[in-house]
């Protein structure tokens, strides 16, 4: 019987301690120093999306389509609002006047890793009801396709 695959339980998120303003190879991602931003609550999907452009002509019954601009993604990442060195670094990266890009890595409990690089904006501070925890939400403006390392390769 096949397994169910990895869940997000036990995973972590970390940001590079230095700016990374140029596209990175996997070996360059691996060569950076990261600090964990603890208490990740949820993260949006990552990966490249690409516009599909169309051109309608009188003589074609079906429009012509082509690939347009690609976007590295703009996922939100939400954390419990608790003090830590990682949160301090993330807040500094998100400052409105900090235009640097940073590398980040999602790591799953099975050892799989996904590396991304981009801008950090925010935070937005959630409110909610009586029994909700304080959370902060940041948006990552990713600048290149992710580099994925499967668990067997780590």
Regions found by a protein language model. Give the residues of each.
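Short, positively charged, low-complexity/disordered linker segments
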Residues: 21, 26, 30-37, 92-111
